[in-house]
Design a protein with these regions (language model features):
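Ubiquitin system architectures
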Residues: 5-23, 35-108
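Short, conserved charged micro-motifs
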Residues: 30-33
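Extreme N-terminal starter segment of soluble prokaryotic enzymes
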Residues: 1-2
Length: 108
C-alpha cells in the first residue's frame, strides 16, 4: 500500500526542508506499526524524547504515539480500514506536540 505523509516542523532549522514523503507499507499495517516504521526513517529525534506525534487523516485524529513511554492511541487499528471507511486518499499528517501535557490540553 502506498501512503503519503507530511509532518510538522519541530524547530526553526527543520522548517528549511519539505516533510512530505511517500512510503510503501504492508497492506495490513496498524497505526502502531506505522509509527515504529517511521521512527527510524522519518520522525526526527527530539532531545529528552518526551513528545507526542498525533496521526491525522484529513483533519481527523486517528492515532497518537507517546515517544518516551512507547505508548499508542488506537495502535491496533489498520490504516487500510481508516482509508476505506473515509472514502478518501492515502494522505496522512503527523502533528507534533512538544510534551504529553500539550497534547492533552489540545484535546480537553
Amino acid at each position: 500500500m502506498h501512503i503519503t505523509i507530511d509532518r510538522d516542523a519541530v524547530c526553526a532549522a527543520d522548517d528549511m526542508s519539505h516533510h512530505r514523503e511517500e512510503f510503501t507499507v504492508p497492506d495490513g499495517i496498524t497505526i502502531a506499526s506505522l509509527f515504529e516504521f517511521l521512527e527510524f526513517k522519518y520522525i526526527p529525534v527530539i532531545a529528552r524524547n518526551n513528545v507526542v506525534w498525533a496521526l491525522y487523516h484529513h483533519e481527523i485524529k486517528v492515532g497518537a504515539y507517546f515517544t518516551k513511554i512507547g505508548s499508542f492511541v488506537n495502535g491496533n487499528i489498520p490504516l487500510s480500514s481508516i482509508i476505506s471507511n473515509s472514502e478518501r486518499d492515502n494522505e496522512f499528517y503527523l502533528r507534533y506536540y512538544s510534551s504529553p501535557d500539550r497534547y492533552r490540553k489540545h484535546f480537553i
